[in-house]
Amino acid sequence: MAKKIVAVIKLALQAGKANPAPPVGPALGQHGVNIMAFCKEYNARTQDKAGFVIPVEISVFEDRSFTFITKTPPASVLITKAAGIEKGSGESAKGSVGNISKAQLEEIAKTKLPDLNCSSVESAMKVIEGTARNMGVSITD
């Protein structure tokens, strides 16, 4: 019989920089998980994605063991990096704070495709384009 899952914890952590300090320590500690083991494994898996925030979904089992799945970085982070801006517009309707090309949009869509509820790159591009528009980033040809 498979192990019983006691909790599912979702965190967004800097790639390669997980440490026992909050938010990791308290979230895992209350379920009795070995925090250092998680930190070492997470850092090893994400060291090639340095500079990005990588969401992680941790499944904690009743024997205090765990498994985790890393997701792709949030679309907003990928868009701000591609546009070369620090953050999106507070008021997206008033004006553009940056631009990204269709090629950059397609690259972001291909990166995010496994985590999006889409089956094709074209539909993923529409989802990412909507996110960019809401951030005040315009798409250029």
Curated annotation (Swiss-Prot):
PTM text: One or more lysine residues are methylated.
GO cellular component: cytosolic large ribosomal subunit
One Pfam family matching this protein: Ribosomal_L11_N
Keywords on record: Methylation, Ribonucleoprotein, Ribosomal protein, RNA-binding, rRNA-binding
One example of a Gene Ontology biological process annotation: translation
GO molecular function: large ribosomal subunit rRNA binding; structural constituent of ribosome
Top-level taxon: Bacteria
HAMAP family: Ribosomal_uL11
Alphabetized PANTHER family for the sequence: 60S RIBOSOMAL PROTEIN L12, LARGE RIBOSOMAL SUBUNIT PROTEIN UL11M
Subunit structure: Part of the ribosomal stalk of the 50S ribosomal subunit. Interacts with L10 and the large rRNA to form the base of the stalk. L10 forms an elongated spine to which L12 dimers bind in a sequential fashion forming a multimeric L10(L12)X complex.
Family: Belongs to the universal ribosomal protein uL11 family.
Protein purpose: Forms part of the ribosomal stalk which helps the ribosome interact with GTP-bound translation factors.
Protein name: Large ribosomal subunit protein uL11
Species the sequence originates in: Prochlorococcus marinus (strain MIT 9301)
Name of the encoding gene: rplK
